[in-house]
Amino acid sequence: MKASEEEYRLNFFIKNDFKRKICKSCKTPFWTRDEKKEYCSDIPCTDYYFFDINIKSQPLTVKEAREKFLSFFEKRGHTRISPKPVLARWREDLYLTIASIVDFQPHVTSGLVPPPANPLVVSQPSIRLEDIDNVGITFGRHLTTFEMAAHHAFNYPDHYVYWKEETTAYATEFFTKELGIPEEELNFKESWWEGGGNAGPCLEVTVGGLELATLVFMQYKITDNGNYTPLKLKIVDTGYGVERIAWITQKTPSAFHAIYGNLVYKFFNKIGVAYIDETLLKVASRFAGKIDPDNPDTIKIHRQMVSKELGIDIKAVEEELDRAAKVFQILDHTKTIMLMLADGLVPSNSGEGYLGRLVIRRALKVLRLLKSDVRLYELVKEQIDFWKEDFPQVLKNKDYILDAVELEQQRFEKILEKVPSIASTLARKSEITTEDLIQVYDSNGIPPDLLEEELKKKSVKFELPRNFYALVAKRHQTSTIKSAYDKVKLPKDMLEYITALQPTEKLYYKDQYMRSFEGKVLGVYKNYLILDKTTFYPEGGGQLGDTGLIIDEKSSKRYEVIDTQKVNDVIVHILKEEPSTIKVGDNVRGEINWERRYRLMRHHTVTHVILAAAKKVLGEHVWQAGAEKTPEKGRLDITHHKTLTEEEVKLIENYANSVISDRRPVKPLEMNRMEAEMKYGVSIYEGGVPNSATIRLLEIKDWDIESCGGTHVSNTSEIGAVKIINVERIQDGVIRLEYVAGPALVDYIRETEAKIVEASKIIGSSPDQLTSRLRRILNEIEEKNNLIIQYRRIIETELLNNLKPYEINGNKIYIIEGLGDEEENKEILRKLTSTDNTIAISISDNRLQIATSKNMRVDKIVEELLKGGGKGGGKGTFANVILNSKKSKEEIIEIVRKSL
């Protein structure tokens, strides 16, 4: 959609002598007070000429630019709010915070909940990976991490705050009065914005080739068929570039110098790269507006312009700028890594962890291309020291950040050992596509740049996509949200049946200890029953649905409830049989299986206790990745970058039992969503993100608070005690803890005791002497194993000395019969085939093991053997074959002869 001219013809522009002009280059309309201006002052229509503009503001650091912006709007009636983490954990569809408006999506922007203040101002650290391949090349125009300073106003039908006129006036005042940019240099370029299903006209604020801000007026919803419908809630969504404000006031040769100051020189030094010639850098930066990274020709033209301007050989220019760009990339990436990990990201192969690992590996790849020996964590440590006052969480989580980065580098170095074999596999393809390279990266973590050198050795050429990492990131930056209907275990016809039914009153929230109740039947469909109220808890939040009885008050017939499910706010009781005596309007009595429910309540509550204990022991990066509570045990999946030690598991268990012994109150409370976020942070969403204006929280006094819709005990003492019974790494970056509490712990102890008694009987020992008896048995086994090894060596020596080969066409063929030990066979075959032109075959009934020397292959021998029927195979120099019938030594020799 393109907005009409009237959308942009503001009274503010008319009153302040702004003229609407059409850019001579891009043909886009823009507003300016300079009647002679012919260009929109945005790149690539102009070079970066802000270096030449007389700006009255003193040079501002990023910190000073941020504070100047926030203070300006605070003085003008805006409430300053704290930024959210760079991990968008209040969103189920997005992993990273890509803009300040994300702070308020989807619940504020949809009108579900009010904003935390109105109007408000925030400086939100953001991460976007769509431009990751362009970082450094454009001297700071593209970054993966940046601060979006923003003022927002939310205009409701009954509450107007401000709109286009005031927003444009604020921008003009800030840039001209606060920063001292000459009024004639300020331009407002007409544009259109779309994102997150919303749209609206916008104005891009440009000065001297630099876009400093975008003023979006969100006023349309984009429907599924692509139409635009007006929104009731009209939102002012602005974005000012804090780093660009610092750059334009400092006029440094690149944005990196303005952002990082002396850290730029420190990075060049630590990486071991000579600093770029200052004059070359200034000229290159001035012409950088001409670079369109998606068009490699523009990069070439830019370098030619620099070469011509300075009279320097083009190759020297390219080498200097390429080297500097790589250092700038590492500066940018290490800050992004720092912020991601500080906010709790754990590198992995999925979700947000995948994106974190992608940035880390790209930084490691660049260091490798620069042939630098510096460890990546050393550079991240420099970033922490530099930003610790701006972002206190980076210092708080410093140990975890550095440990995780070093571990990732070690893993990356191990992965690179696979490069030769992966390159060999790729070299066999007739054409290497971008999809092939992405597949190799996703499966093995190997960047294509590092495959390139290996493939060149094999004379294989391929085109490396310039935006490779952006392509990969795009595939992984969002998550699909399941609807309420996708999450339940109910048939489609049942889902359709309940759409017209009223919400069920949740008695289990009024009293979690209520065991029975009376309710009215609202719906009966097959073996599904819906009541007006219930104390049966439906499956959710990892807690199984309740079971129990429904009793027909007329006939006194009892129906067994085998499960309980929920769709939106309607609770469905699943019966073992169809309730033939019950119809709509009847009154029934419900009784939950209390012993089962109470076990679930204990396991659910202790899950919260253990999660907080894990954070205390392992660090704030720990995040719930999944959970399940059954009557028999609880399961909690947490994010963590390495396997837990026995000591860590013991500490988590000790903390949990200490909290149980402390008899801490456990209290559910309801709170406005925004109020809860502002008070407790987004960690309240560890168990999932509820879609409601008011959210239910569970507070364990002075220990944990989290959004949770489950059922819990009212005091930690009711849990009794907890024992962690299993710990395993279920996937990269995720650790699973399994535990038992209360009666389930007693069951576990009894089962363990029974196993000890049984084991004692088997080895002829009493339970209290089990350990010493086992030690004696193990010592005996070890002695016998050593004896077996000695006998094997004697047999092996005897066999090798006496075995005579068959000669076929200059090849030696050894046949071994009757050895039963597979590992012993392999070792003998390996020794027999240590010289060229040798084949060794071990025969045991109809089973064959075949080995060849390195200059031969087993393929053809296997193929010939299987002609007579059988199965098996192998590759290279070893194979296993099972024949349909046993063959003599002579028959085997003849088959081998044919294969040769």
Swiss-Prot record:
Q: Which GO terms describe its biological process?
A: alanyl-tRNA aminoacylation
Q: Which residues bind Zn(2+)?
A: H604, H608, C708, H712
Q: Where in the cell is it found?
A: Cytoplasm
Reaction(s) catalysed by this chain, per the record, are: tRNA(Ala) + L-alanine + ATP = L-alanyl-tRNA(Ala) + AMP + diphosphate
Q: Which cofactor does it need?
A: Zn(2+)
Indicate the principal place this protein occupies in or around the cell: cytoplasm
| Gene Ontology MF term list | alanine-tRNA ligase activity; aminoacyl-tRNA deacylase activity; ATP binding; tRNA binding; zinc ion binding
Domain comment?
Consists of three domains; the N-terminal catalytic domain, the editing domain and the C-terminal C-Ala domain. The editing domain removes incorrectly charged amino acids, while the C-Ala domain, along with tRNA(Ala), serves as a bridge to cooperatively bring together the editing and aminoacylation centers thus stimulating deacylation of misacylated tRNAs.
Q: What does this gene product do?
A: Catalyzes the attachment of alanine to tRNA(Ala) in a two-step reaction: alanine is first activated by ATP to form Ala-AMP and then transferred to the acceptor end of tRNA(Ala). Also edits incorrectly charged Ser-tRNA(Ala) and Gly-tRNA(Ala) via its editing domain.
Q: From the Swiss-Prot or TrEMBL record, give the protein name.
A: Alanine--tRNA ligase
Q: What lineage, starting at the top, does this entry show?
A: Archaea, Thermoproteota, Thermoprotei, Sulfolobales, Sulfolobaceae
Q: Which gene encodes it?
A: alaS
